[in-house]
Amino acid sequence: MSQGAKPGKGGMLPGRKVNAEIAKIRGIPEGQDSISPNGHPEIKNPADILDMIATVRNATGKPTGFKAVIGAYGWLETLFAEINHRGIESAPDFITIDSADGGTGAAPQPLMDSVGLPLRESLPLVVNMLEKHGLRDRIKIIASGKLIVPSKVAWALALGADFVVSARGHMFALGCIQAMQCNKDTCPTGITTHNERLQRGLNVADKAQRVANYNKYIHYGAGLIAHSCGVTSARELRREHVRIVQESGLSEPLDKIYENYK
């Protein structure tokens, strides 16, 4: 539905990265910018989202959901009410909530800087809305957006996420140096380029081990934080385990700042 770095806009793959293989797959001329629309023409309202989910689920037989960065949230109220009207089996299997401060290789600067809600607001908001509509057990919540260290992963789970995903963390594990050349096809580390000469700089065997080590550390670190909070796993973390420092310099637990959930 939308991405944190560019809510309200579709994707753009610069022409210099549209090689013969991509051109064939997408059905566009080689070397031409590939502009994706900012929405699906089949989806005009929240009810259409459920129709599309049913279509994809029936075609693939796999769990189906959607990803969105949250801004105005009235459409979610309508969506959840429609689910209860149709029946709980019509619900998406998951919703991925992307933070407004998420990253991308190409997006307009005003959208990256100023549009959408950060995860600290949108995640508890959506979790509470699911509780309100009795859908919390049916729909799983996936959190994304700069969740690259164990403390951030533990924080997201405490706020109500069922899962956490991270693109940025894995890019760092691969060796990303933030050269800011993703859109130019000149990534010096070989990660985001289609240039075969530059790609040779990415040693797959070496980077595979680094990525494995990164994931192992994330799991270990999140578990370590959970044990320090007195629970046996990170999935048992709740808002009461997290505190936020206020302007006064004193901290408040999240279950006081946000209405808690079961």
Say what each PLM segment does:
Residues 1-31:
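Flexible glycine-/small-residue-enriched beta->alpha junction loops
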Residues 6-10, 105, 235:
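Short helix/loop capping segments that flank catalytic or ligand/cofactor-binding pockets
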Residues 23, 27-30, 40, 45, ...:
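Short capping/connector residues at structural and topological boundaries
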Residues 31-39, 201-205:
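Short glycine/proline- and acidic residue-enriched helix-loop micro-motifs
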Residues 175, 200-262:
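C-terminal extensions of enzymes
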